Curated annotation (Swiss-Prot):
The EamA domain, residue ranges: 30-158, 216-317
Keywords: Membrane, Repeat, Transmembrane, Transmembrane helix
Family to which the UniProt record says this protein belongs: Belongs to the drug/metabolite transporter (DMT) superfamily. Plant drug/metabolite exporter (P-DME) (TC 2.A.7.4) family.
Record protein name field: WAT1-related protein At4g15540
Lineage: superkingdom: Eukaryota
Length: 347
């Protein structure tokens, strides 16, 4: 009985989060692949973003009714609702930049550039004075070096293609604009880093994962719907035809935007941000395989070299963050041990 209890705890603590994080990376890449396939057939990315948010909002509404707690949602006049609205505006802008970036380049480039997120977050944390820069600290040195290496790797991917390593059967004559796509994807993950900082602040004052994600998607739906009405005046572009267009919207709304966000937030609570981040470079390999199979993308030497450099910088930043967190934990525990003895001396 005791062995079964230990096995169940191990399964729940380690196996479930591990499997969930791999599934999330596959889901994210799969959404990018389907979206790319849909846009190659003329599907408007504004319409895609709007319908994806609509689908996510409906799914999260159902989840909030089933699993939601009795705590009331923030009112439209509250400062919390304004922050969630700002979060939606940031998320929507980031997503539009990302969709356009994938349209100009490829899902593989998107997966590679996504590894810049920790470096961007570190830079923004310094800018907003949320991060203390101690140049003599090994943790700070690792984060600085990792940030520089990550950005260098991203530049290699964007600016240098090199010879072809894997030539797949191309299903389209679409000519990509690699540099423009790389810049847009860089903007996407820069905005996403700001999004993470604001989301962390919101979760501290309102720790309701499903409610926050639901309100976020609802606001994003309203904003994207307004933008879509202004940009896409041809009503025919709003039609969801059977095929990649419909599949990309359903897949993104059901799995990526809604359930993916909830599982990602759950993973942050269960295992922490460092553990979640360790799986990001895995998306590069997944994207290379899926893009070659389903889109006929060609793999270049520059993408491989840049991805290796970027992944090294990524893990260096993560190591520095983990080192900093462990140092803080040891320091706090030492202080908690010293305080009682100090009190006894005064008595």
């Amino acid at each position: 009985m005791r062995e079964e209890t230990v096995s169940w705890k191990y399964f729940k603590r380690d196996v479930v989060p591990f499997t969930a994080m791999i599934a999330i990376e596959c889901t994210t890449v799969g959404s990018s692949i389907l979206y790319k396939a849909a846009t190659l057939r003329g599907f408007s990315f504004y319409v895609f973003v709007f319908y994806a948010y609509v689908g996510a909002t409906l799914v999260l509404l159902l989840l909030s009714l089933i699993f939601g707690r009795s705590r009331s949602l923030p009112t439209a006049k509250s400062s919390l609702f304004f922050k969630i609205f700002l979060l939606a505006l940031l998320g929507l802008t980031s997503r539009v930049a990302g969709c356009k970036g994938i349209e100009y380049s490829s899902p593989t480039l998107s997966s590679a550039i996504s590894n810049l997120t920790p470096a961007f977050t570190f830079i923004l944390a310094i800018f907003f004075r949320m991060e203390q820069v101690m140049l003599r600290s090994s943790a700070t040195q690792a984060k600085i070096i990792g940030t520089i290496v990550s950005i260098s790797g991203a530049l290699v991917i964007v600016l240098y293609k090199g010879p072809k390593l894997l030539v797949a059967a191309s299903f389209t004559s679409f000519e990509s604009s690699w540099i423009i796509g790389g810049l847009l994807l860089g903007l996407q993950f820069l905005l996403l880093s700001v999004w993470f900082i604001l989301q962390t602040h919101i979760m501290e004052i309102y720790p309701e994962e499903i409610a926050v994600v639901f309100c976020y998607n609802l606001c994003a739906t309203l904003i994207s719907g307004t933008v879509c009405l202004l940009v896409e005046k041809d009503l025919n572009s709003w039609q969801l035809k059977p095929g990649f267009s419909l599949a990309s919207v359903i897949y993104s709304g059901l799995f990526d935007t809604s359930l993916g966000s909830v599982i990602h937030t759950w993973g942050l609570h269960v295992k922490g941000p460092v553990y979640i981040s360790l799986f990001k470079p895995l998306s590069i390999a997944i994207a290379v395989a899926m893009a070659a199979i389903f889109l006929g993308d060609t793999l270049h030497l520059g993408s491989v070299i840049g991805s290796v450099i970027l992944s090294f910088g990524f893990y260096t930043v993560i190591w520095g963050k983990a080192r900093e967190d462990s140092t803080k934990t040891v320091s706090d525990s030492e202080q908690s041990l010293l305080l009682p003895s100090h009190d006894r001396e005064e008595d």
